[in-house]
Amino acid sequence: MKKIFIFAAAGLLLVAGCKGGKKAAGDSVTEPEAAASVAAGPKVMAREVPERMDDFVFENDLIAGRFYGKALEGDPTSPGLDVWVKLPGKLVADDWYAHAVSDPEYYHHDHGGKDCYKVSVSLGGGASAPLVGGKLSYPATNWREAAVLSQSDDAVTFVLKYPAWDAGGVSVRLEKTVTVTAGSYFCKVEDRYYGDFQELEIAAGFWIHEWKEGCAMGTDDDFIALWEPASDQSVEPEDGMIGIALVMPAEHMTEILDDGEKRHHICIAKVRSGEPLTYWFGSCWSKGDIKDFQQWTNTVKSQAGAAGIAAASSN
């Protein structure tokens, strides 16, 4: 098994790798110590937020994030994941949105966490898009349909639907199914692309923001990982560091994609129409339980291992 890890304080190293298709989907690995501190009651949530520009927000006791809806199109139109940082232990999204009704900047300030991650037009903290001629072909709109498919105190699954758009002369549409599990830094994703194609090349990954002192990046057979400043905002003097990762057990290639404006670390795989592309996106905050890139890498490796075990049992 080939393993490559990159730790860098300055400069950006291009990493390329290839792995075999011996694994597929599985369950998320949990963090028992963090989960044990959570009070009784729901430990997950996911819902549409019509009161805030049609966001679709989700969270568990460790992580939170959102995908942009119709009302925000153009500012930006992006399939990317907007990562929220937060301290472990409780759900915060509903409280933050409630305060934002009277103070729109409320969740941009630290209240045990905050929204300080910049998405722009990108894959953000973990999403996918067709790869056409070496460039990402983003959906022409934000999500237009959403539904919660199942929900309990410990897990919630939802689907977001993106209408058809032109991807290099091929009309494709996307159905994104996400499962959020209590006690995990990762969410499982099944992206299904539909269209009149035999195979479609898909890139799943995350945006690499400005490379600064303290940044680090690594890759292995089953994952790509990043450690970078949590924010490029100036609202707070110090927002700490954020860990981002994407786990993909299926056969894929990895590379750094630079279009002159943004750099993404991506996993590239081919899918047939309606075939699920399964991966996990994950995040952490240095002000929480995971303090450095080594801890984050260990957590990511555990998730990759869990995905592989589940894949082996399903094949």
Model feature map: region roles:
Residues I4-L13:
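Sec-dependent N-terminal signal peptides
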Residues G26-S137:
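Solvent-exposed N-terminal domain segments of exported/luminal and surface proteins
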Residues K19-G21:
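Bacterial signal peptide processing site
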Residues I244-N315:
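Beta-strand-rich recognition/accessory modules
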Residues E105-T181:
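Extended, loop-rich substrate-binding clefts of extracytoplasmic carbohydrate-active enzymes
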Residues V15-G17:
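C-terminal motif of bacterial Sec signal peptides marking the signal peptidase cleavage site
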Residues L174, Y185-G218:
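Acidic (Asp/Glu-rich), glycine- and aromatic
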Residues Y194, E210-R263:
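Accessory, usually C-terminal, subdomains that scaffold auxiliary metal cofactors
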